[in-house]
Amino acid sequence: MEEGPAVGTLSREVSTEEAEPLGAAWSGDSGHVSQSHSSASGPWDDDGPEDAPGRDLPLLRRAASGYASSLLPSAGPRPEVEALDASLEELLAKVDEFVGMLDMIRGDSSHVVGEGVPRIHAKAAEMRRIYGRIDKLEAFVRMIGSSVARMEEQVAKAEAELGTFPRAFRRLLHTISVPALFRSAPSGPQRAAYEPPVLFRTEDHFPGCGDRPQL
């Protein structure tokens, strides 16, 4: 019965001696610093060299993730994607309108070349004939103008020779009989007979006018 307390005291001493080395191993007073890398330390806590492999890998992963989220379609609609779709739809609509306008212009061009050009050639030939008639008419008008100018010269000359008395007054003077005593001999030379100028004939320039019935 006396060995019980002694055995208990011995066991407590052994457990205390075993606990001291374990506590020294975990305490900071032992002089040994743990070289193990904490799992909580981040990638920016690495004090290795700059050209160490895998140093920029987290940055590259984050950049790739950002580009992927911007380019790849996501579950919900994104504002920039919707704006890009709207601009593409508007551009396609304008391209369709431009293509339709080109088709219309091409059709109009073929219509003009196929039908308009022959009609223009025919009208050009007709206009050349009309221009020839206009030239002939201008020459005819110039000839009439010269004839009228000659007639005006002869009328002015006749008025100067015969006087400007009215025709009725001259007839009245010619009807009055004057005695032979009061008649005087002609003082000047006798006037030559009147010769009318040569005028144009309308039939020479317009052949069909002579065949028309006179009204």
From Swiss-Prot:
Localisation per UniProt entry: Cytoplasm
Keywords: Albinism, Coiled coil, Cytoplasm, Phosphoprotein
Name of the protein: Biogenesis of lysosome-related organelles complex 1 subunit 4
Expressing tissues: Widely expressed.
Principal location class: cytoplasm
Disease with which this protein is associated in UniProt: Defects in Cno are the cause of the cappuccino (Cno) mutant, which is characterized by a severe oculocutaneous albinism due to abnormal melanosome formation, and prolonged bleeding due to deficiency of platelet dense body contents.
Role according to the record: Component of the BLOC-1 complex, a complex that is required for normal biogenesis of lysosome-related organelles (LRO), such as platelet dense granules and melanosomes. In concert with the AP-3 complex, the BLOC-1 complex is required to target membrane protein cargos into vesicles assembled at cell bodies for delivery into neurites and nerve terminals. The BLOC-1 complex, in association with SNARE proteins, is also proposed to be involved in neurite extension. Plays a role in intracellular vesicle trafficking.
Keyword Cytoplasm: yes
GO CC entries: axon cytoplasm; BLOC-1 complex; cytoplasm
Annotated positions of the Phosphothreonine modification: T164
Subunit structure and binding partners: Octamer composed of one copy each BLOC1S1, BLOC1S2, BLOC1S3, BLOC1S4, BLOC1S5, BLOC1S6, DTNBP1/BLOC1S7 and SNAPIN/BLOC1S8. Component of the biogenesis of lysosome-related organelles complex 1 (BLOC-1) composed of BLOC1S1, BLOC1S2, BLOC1S3, BLOC1S4, BLOC1S5, BLOC1S6, DTNBP1/BLOC1S7 and SNAPIN/BLOC1S8. The BLOC-1 complex associates with the AP-3 protein complex and membrane protein cargos. Interacts with BLOC1S5 and BLOC1S6.
PANTHER family: BIOGENESIS OF LYSOSOME-RELATED ORGANELLES COMPLEX 1 SUBUNIT 4, CAPPUCCINO
GO biological process: anterograde axonal transport; anterograde synaptic vesicle transport; melanosome organization; neuromuscular process controlling balance; neuron projection development; platelet aggregation
Family label: Belongs to the BLOC1S4 family.
